């Protein structure tokens, strides 16, 4: 079985949540082939992931544009979301083609939604693992904005 895992590079928490799950999966399914896409440092991945994996150094989300570790740059984040969704159907089609070429049996994200949309278009099963998600955070900060409808 081939598992494609997309881990948000927005901090280290997404890896901290995902790594124990992946390590446990590999223990019960040692022949599991894993492809991981993230921009997190390879050294950090090697500390947390106790199995061989193919690394795709890329990011499918940005989370939020941050001023510092605890403050969101709301105007910059709003602009980034508008840009990310300006041509959403084309982005989803590109992601679906990427996933179809990669041929995973399952797509797992923590917690980018682009791979979920691409997997749906490509007819691949997918799921997300997280203690939070961008949709709820987005609604908290931007639901009142006309452009966010």
Regions inferred by a protein language model and the residue ranges of each:
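Short amphipathic alpha-helical segments
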Residues: 19, 119-122, 140
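Conserved nucleotide-sugar phosphate-binding/catalytic loop shared by glycosyltransferases and other
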Residues: 32-86
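Conserved nucleotide-sugar donor-binding subdomain of glycosyltransferases
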Residues: 72-106
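N-terminal subdomain of nucleotide-sugar transferases
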Residues: 1-51
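An aromatic- and histidine-rich active-site surface loop
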Residues: 44, 107-121
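Active-site-proximal region of nucleotide-activated glycan assembly enzymes
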Residues: 125-149
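Helix C-cap/helix->beta junction micro-motif
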Residues: 30, 102, 122-124
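Structural motif
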Residues: 4-6, 108, 129
């Amino acid at each position: 079985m081939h598992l494609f895992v997309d881990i948000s590079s927005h901090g280290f928490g997404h890896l901290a949540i995902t790594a124990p799950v992946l390590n446990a999966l590999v223990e019960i399914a040692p022949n599991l082939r894993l492809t991981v896409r993230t921009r997190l440092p390879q050294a950090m991945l090697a500390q947390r992931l106790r199995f061989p994996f193919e690394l795709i150094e890329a990011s499918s989300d940005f989370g939020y544009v941050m001023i510092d570790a605890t403050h969101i740059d709301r105007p910059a984040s709003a602009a980034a979301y508008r840009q990310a969704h300006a041509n959403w159907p084309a982005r989803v089609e590109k992601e679906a083609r990427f996933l179809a070429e990669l041929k995973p049996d399952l797509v797992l994200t923590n917690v980018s939604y682009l791979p979920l949309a691409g997997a749906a278009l490509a007819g691949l099963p997918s799921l997300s693992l997280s203690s939070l998600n961008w949709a709820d955070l987005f609604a908290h900060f931007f639901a009142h904005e006309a452009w966010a409808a």
